[in-house]
């Protein structure tokens, strides 16, 4: 029985969720014990909550990596119309991934078999392993499948080198971040066999340039990874490339089919179902909610509701990476009231101007309220709070919140 999880990274936005999930299903159909990191900016928590259960039952996990904030800006130009800005997200892999080695996969691909040999490939001192672009008809390597030496990327600040090179060259390159990756790593990578990134999506290009040798490559058995590059995607209403049906097979496959296959092989683990023991709420008019990241990490069994009457700053939106934090931007007093009614505890943790609605609802519905010493309201007496705790010792707040659990 495998004890360690293999690290995999996908990146994409909510508009691409069907493609992301299809690629994930194909990967999980043939590989278990996967720790999948999904770099994104806008995929809802509910999707993560359900898919995470499936991964956990196969001995893996799913990590929601929110690229929200100025440090994750990806507003570089890209000359390929079928590729959006999220392709640059792979630059930030060392920010989120803790494993020394990680497999990055584009979302427009299908895995057809066991990738153990790929996961176990020794990278040595190379920065990554990748397959040649378009079977040698392209330039350099294709960046859709990368086995990354994450330890080396982290120690040598590769993220910043990629950003600096992109700032300098993005208007001059033809293939976006793929060109940048080729420029930076040049000959400092290992070559993968074509079967690990079989670019079936190049069919249209191969036919255009009369590359008959590509159509002579056997497709039985199927290559281990089919990559539907180019604009000729199999999920379009019409496409002309081969193996469109393989993509649809996995897209329409139910997760139960995948799970039952692993269960039949005695790969079955309990999922960590999210059962909250306490509901807490805060109304904020500020981006700064004291120690909320720390509290969310320390108290996974507590559901934190963060409400604002306006748009929220990135610092608050990024909290959605925690499965136990729900944010409500642009809410209204009557909606806040319903959340307070359903909550067990009011956390007066926001800085700057306080909004009286919160205190009125706390009083009306007799909800207990606690605060840090640097966030309690100047307009309320200490007896309005059931506890005020030092912000310099947040573990005391953790203990206080735990004391209210059912």
UniProtKB/Swiss-Prot annotation:
Needed co-factor(s): Mn(2+)
More info: Encoded in RD10, a pathogenicity island with an atypical GC content that is associated with invasive pneumococcal disease. Pathogenicity islands account for greater than half the genomic diversity observed between isolates. The main function of this island seems to be correct synthesis and export of pneumococcal serine-rich repeat protein PsrP.
Top-level taxonomic group: Bacteria
PANTHER family assigned: GLYCOSYLTRANSFERASE 8 DOMAIN-CONTAINING PROTEIN, LIPOPOLYSACCHARIDE 1,3-GALACTOSYLTRANSFERASE
Name this polypeptide is given: Glycosyltransferase GlyE
Transmembrane helix found in the keyword field: no
BP terms from Gene Ontology: protein glycosylation
Role description: Involved in the polymorphic O-glycosylation of the serine-rich repeat protein PsrP. Catalyzes the third step in glycosylation of PsrP in this bacteria. Transfers galactose from UDP-galactose to the terminal glucose moiety of already-glycosylated PsrP (using the short substrate PsrP-GlcNAc-Glc). Has a very marked preference for PsrP substrate that has already been modified by GlcNAc and glucose. Has hydrolytic activity against UDP-galactose but none against UDP-glucose.
Protein keywords: Glycosyltransferase, Manganese, Metal-binding, Nucleotide-binding, Transferase
UniProt binding sites for Mn(2+): 106, 108, 227
Pfam family, one: Glyco_transf_8
Binding site for UDP: 11-16, 106-107, 227-233
Coiled-coil regions listed in the entry: none
Claim: Transferase is one of the keywords in the record: yes
Source species of the chain: Streptococcus pneumoniae serotype 4 (strain ATCC BAA-334 / TIGR4)
Phenotypic consequence of residue 108 to A: Loss of UDP-galactose hydrolysis
Pathway annotation from the record: Protein modification; protein glycosylation
């Amino acid at each position: 029985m495998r004890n360690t999880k293999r690290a995999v990274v996908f990146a994409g936005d909510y508009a691409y969720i069907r493609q992301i999930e299809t690629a994930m299903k194909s990967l999980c159909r043939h590989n278990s014990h996967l720790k999948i990191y999904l770099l994104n900016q806008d995929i809802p928590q509910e999707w993560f909550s359900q898919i995470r259960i499936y991964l956990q039952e196969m001995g893996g996990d799913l990590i929601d990596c929110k690229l929200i904030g100025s440090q994750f800006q990806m507003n570089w130009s890209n000359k390929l119309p079928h590729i959006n800005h999220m392709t640059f997200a792979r630059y930030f892999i060392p920010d989120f991934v803790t494993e020394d080695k990680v497999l990055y996969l584009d979302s427009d691909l299908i895995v057809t078999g066991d990738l153990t040999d790929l996961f176990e490939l020794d990278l040595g001192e190379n920065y990554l392993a990748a397959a040649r672009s378009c079977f040698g008809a392209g330039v350099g390597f294709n960046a859709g499948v990368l086995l990354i030496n994450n330890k080396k990327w982290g120690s040598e600040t590769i993220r910043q080198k990629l950003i600096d090179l992109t700032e300098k060259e993005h208007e001059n390159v033809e293939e976006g971040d793929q060109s940048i990756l080729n420029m930076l790593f040049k000959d400092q990578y290992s070559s993968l066999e074509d079967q690990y990134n079989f670019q079936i999506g190049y069919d249209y290009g191969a036919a255009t340039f009369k590359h008959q040798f590509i159509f002579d490559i056997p497709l039985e058995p199927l290559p281990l990874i089919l990559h539907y590059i180019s604009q000729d995607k199999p999920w379009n209403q019409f496409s002309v490339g081969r193996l469109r049906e393989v993509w649809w097979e996995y897209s329409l496959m139910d997760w139960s089919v995948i799970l039952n296959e692993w269960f039949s092989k005695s790969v079955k683990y309990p999922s960590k179902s999210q059962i909250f023991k306490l509901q807490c709420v805060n109304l904020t008019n500020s981006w700064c909610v004291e120690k909320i990241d720390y509290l969310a990490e320390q108290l996974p069994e507590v559901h934190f509701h963060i409400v604002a009457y306006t748009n929220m700053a990135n610092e608050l939106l990024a909290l959605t990476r925690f499965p136990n934090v729900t944010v409500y931007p642009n809410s209204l007093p009557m909606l806040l009231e319903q959340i307070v009614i359903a909550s067990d505890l009011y956390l007066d943790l926001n800085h700057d101007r306080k909004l009286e609605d919160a205190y009125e609802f706390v009083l009306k519905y007799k909800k207990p309220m606690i605060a840090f010493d640097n966030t309690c309201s100047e307009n309320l007496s200490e007896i309005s709070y059931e506890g005020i705790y030092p912000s310099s010792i947040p573990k005391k707040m953790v203990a206080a919140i735990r004391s209210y659990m059912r």
